[in-house]
Amino acid sequence: MIVQQQQRSPEWHAQRKLRLTGSRVGAILGLSPWQKPDDVLRDMVREYHGAESEFTGNPATDWGNRHETRALLAFMRETGLQVEQCGFFPYGDRMGASPDGLTSDGGVLELKAPYGLRKGGEFKPLAEQPHYAAQVQMEMLATGRNHAYFSQYRAPYGDPLSHDYVQEAMHIERVEHDAGWIDRVLPELDLFYKRLLAELDNPEHLEPLRVSIDTPEAGLLLTELDTLRQRQEEDAEREKAIIAELVAQAGDKNALVHGRKLTKTKDSKSVAYAKALAELAPGADLSKWESVRKGGWRLS
């Protein structure tokens, strides 16, 4: 018998160890805009050894957690369905998923409250979010259910009397189980799992990603750097103001200013080739045209 554990409880975390879960499968398949397969591998190794999670949350996850209950109530109000909250469903010996709920019509529910849409904007369909599509398919596979609801919720935002007040909104898609999905992705999941097992005893995953420097000397260097950056910003603003004043003196015409050319440049267009290729030739092998850009260091 499968015992359902409350989500995010110690027992729930224990059930998920060394399992390729619904929330991670999109990243494992290289579909996530936020995580790479190597990031998931490191997280899973650390989880296996009981190391502290390196992800402590961000505004997007905080927003989603804060509005989870409202999103659930709005879904039930909109659809008339009841939702039973649930825990982790294992699938086989190395996969599983934790949907946000089981619907009274025999489906599963995945709720999202997109942080990027909190102030308005259009909901993206699931077809444009393949990492979530993979999550939903894994949830149906693990629960043995044949359909799912992918529900996106936007909470009211701002002052109701203001012109820019954002009203509550919801976008719900019914998704059918794709019986061939697991066969298509299983080879890639198998490769990842073999890599995971091979890396379980690699101590690098348990070491900090960054060393910590708290010396007085480093503090002085940061202060100097911040001062330089502030000065650069101020210089850039002053440069724009000077150019604007010269343009005004020239009457918005090309001019010679003490022998130096003041020239109006024309608008130009550019093509986002990477985005165009991804849309026009998805999955194309571009390795022949790849080049290596030498890395460096940046301080943020």
Identify the residue ranges that each predicted region occupies.
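Accessory terminal regions of nucleic-acid processing enzymes
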Residues: M1-S300
